[in-house]
C-alpha cells in the first residue's frame, strides 16, 4: 500500500511539472528565467498563497533576499526576476510551508522547504523549481532549459 501511495505521489508530481512549460505574458509566448510551481499533495491541487522567497549567496557568503512572491491560483509564481538580473550564482528558494499548512488548520513538521542550486554556470538558462508538499514531507524537482526552447 505504501508503494502505491508513493507511486501516485510521484505521478502527481510528474503531471504538474510537465505543465510548467511556456506561459503567456501579455499575449506574448515567453518563459520566465525563474518560475516556481507548488502542488498540495494532500488535496491533489495547486498550493495557493504559498509565500516564496529567493535568496542569492553574496561574496561575503551570506544570503541576500533576491526576490519574493506568493503562489497564484495555479500554484505558480512567474516574473520573479528578469533575464538581465538573473545572473550566475548560488540561489536558495525558500517555501514557507508552515504558514501554508497552518492556514489550512494543519500542524506540519517542516517550517520551510529550501532548494539551493547553482544557476547559469554553464550559460544562461531558464529554471522551473517545482515543489510537492505534504505536512510531513516534501519533494522538489527542477526543469532547466535553454531560453529558446
From Swiss-Prot:
Positions carrying 4-carboxyglutamate: 64
PROSITE patterns from the UniProt entry: TRANSTHYRETIN_1, TRANSTHYRETIN_2
Keywords: Gamma-carboxyglutamic acid, Hormone, Secreted, Signal, Sulfation, Thyroid hormone, Transport
Residues bearing PTM Sulfocysteine: 32
Residues annotated as binding L-thyroxine: 37, 76, 139
Cell location: Secreted
Membrane-crossing segments per the record: none
Domain of life: Eukaryota
Signal peptide: 1-20
Post-translational modification: Sulfonation of the reactive cysteine Cys-32 enhances the stability of the native conformation of TTR, avoiding misassembly of the protein leading to amyloid formation.
InterPro entries given in the database record: Thyroxine_BS, Transthyretin/HIU_hydrolase, Transthyretin/HIU_hydrolase_d, Transthyretin/HIU_hydrolase_sf, Transthyretin_CS
Main localisation: secreted
MF terms (GO), sorted A to Z: hormone activity; thyroid hormone binding
Swiss-Prot/TrEMBL GO biological process terms: purine nucleobase metabolic process
Family: Belongs to the transthyretin family.
Reported function: Thyroid hormone-binding protein. Probably transports thyroxine from the bloodstream to the brain.
Self-association and partners: Homotetramer. Dimer of dimers. In the homotetramer, subunits assemble around a central channel that can accommodate two ligand molecules. Interacts with RBP4.
Protein name (record): Transthyretin
Protein source organism: Notamacropus eugenii
Amino acid at each position: 500500500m505504501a508503494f502505491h501511495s508513493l507511486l501516485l505521489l510521484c505521478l502527481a508530481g510528474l503531471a504538474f511539472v510537465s505543465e510548467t512549460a511556456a506561459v503567456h505574458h501579455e499575449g506574448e509566448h515567453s518563459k520566465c528565467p525563474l518560475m516556481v510551481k507548488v502542488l498540495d499533495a494532500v488535496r491533489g491541487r495547486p498550493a495557493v498563497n504559498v509565500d516564496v522567497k529567493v535568496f542569492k549567496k553574496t561574496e561575503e557568503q551570506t544570503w541576500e533576499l533576491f526576490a519574493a512572491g506568493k503562489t497564484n491560483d495555479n500554484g505558480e509564481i512567474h516574473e520573479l526576476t528578469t533575464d538581465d538580473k538573473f545572473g550566475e550564482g548560488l540561489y536558495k528558494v525558500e517555501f514557507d510551508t508552515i504558514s501554508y499548512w497552518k492556514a489550512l488548520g494543519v500542524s506540519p513538521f517542516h517550517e520551510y522547504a529550501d532548494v539551493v542550486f547553482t544557476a547559469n554556470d554553464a550559460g544562461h538558462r531558464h529554471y522551473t523549481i517545482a515543489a510537492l508538499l505534504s505536512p510531513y514531507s516534501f519533494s522538489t524537482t527542477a526543469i532547466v532549459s535553454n531560453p529558446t526552447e
